[in-house]
Amino acid sequence: MKTLGLSLTLVFSLPAMAHLNGAKPHMDPQMTSAEYRNYLSTQKSSNKNVKTLEDLDPRIEKSIKLGERLSKWVNKINAGRTAETAIRLTSPETRISYPINKPNKYNPTILAAEATALETSMPKAMVDVIWSNSELPADTNGIDDKTFAAQGRLLDRNYQGAARYKSLSPWIEEYKWAAASDVRGYYYLKTNNIKAEDLTDVASMSPEKLDLVKEALFRTCRNYEGTKETQCQKVVDESVTNNGLADLYNFTIDAAKTNWDSFFKITESARRKDVTWLNDIMTVPFNTPELTKFIPYLQDNIEDEFRFGTWGLKLNWGTFENGPRLVFKAGEVPHVNGLGGNEITMDSNQPIEEYESRWTIRHEFGHVIGFPDCYHEFYDEKLEAFVNYQLDTTDLMCSRAGNMKERMYNELKEAYAPTAE
């Protein structure tokens, strides 16, 4: 047991790793195809970061081209229709979430297999158009709208995976590092209520449970900055051999919890200094936009979202040197310049009336008042694939299907409400 203790001490000698990394683009897992197109188009025209199609794996190139052709076909069909009868491939109702126990995994092999399967399963009338270079028809080529939309949606999601792969590939080394912040080990232990005392007798555990526990503890080991996969695998193997899984649990669980909490907590450095909290009203200053149409856009969305019970958030309009402000740039992925930052950058190509824009401004304002994202993405070197998931698919800061939750109110109260003396 002394040998195991020494191994643990050597491996766990560094502080827990923070999951935030400012260099990567801020791209939530549920971006729409239109948002990917805007981003890739802007990056290409400015010769930024993103590889050209010729530099990519040809399988990624194929999925992107198929998705682009589908988009052009849908646009041509909708040009002759009303807004009510237009074909929609994306909507709040059809959006897919990626819960922590069913993560999204994508790479050229996975995406190519999906595209091949779709070529086989889609109606021939769709395949004949999308997988060719012929003139695009102005109708659905004889396919009923429901079938066309359902099948088109599958190919559109394949396009999104390919576009995301292309967008994130320039930062693949950073995404490899992000694997150390994978929370699934802690999540498994927490949701299954596994404690150290449950791990004191390795011999009594079923092979199936042992495999799950080993995987979980490997991941909690990786929640320390500087640990390598080989180191953590060695420690896990030693813990099994020496009946030391309980020790490994005790060595890693606090850091794993800290890592988990870092996706939800408003840290001291992210807390704003210009917020007031009086009774049930939290007031945040905001620079008055030059165009008056953006005042109700901001006020209606932000004040509607950030309320809980009798409590509510209010914006205080004015001119503030260090206050939040709204900025629009073409093709930019919406983001804030840091947690507790002041500059909310939105894509000027996206109409503010659309649902995606209305959700985005609510989510981005969450960063202004200090909330981190509670989704995670990394590159799994064993799978050779990107992996992403949302820690809570009902939470505004995790998912486009999410809303303000009680935990967010409690976090705001802890960060900003005056303490009773």
Question: What is each of the regions a protein language model found here?
Answer:
Residues I295-Q299, E303, R362, T394, ...:
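Extracytoplasmic/secreted envelope proteins and their assembly/folding machinery
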Residues E303-W311, H367-C374, A417:
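Sec-exported extracytoplasmic/periplasmic mature domains
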Residues I281-L339:
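Auxiliary, metal-adjacent structural segments of Zn-dependent hydrolase domains
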Residues W359, F365-K382:
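Catalytic Zn2+-binding segment of zinc metalloproteases
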Residues G341-R362:
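Short pre-active-site segment immediately N-terminal to the catalytic Zn-binding motif
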Residues M1-N21:
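Classical Sec-dependent N-terminal signal peptides that target proteins to the secretory pathway
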Residues E381-E421:
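Post-HExxH zinc-binding segment in Zn-dependent metallohydrolases
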Residues A18-D304:
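N-terminal low-structure segments adjacent to metalloprotease catalytic domains
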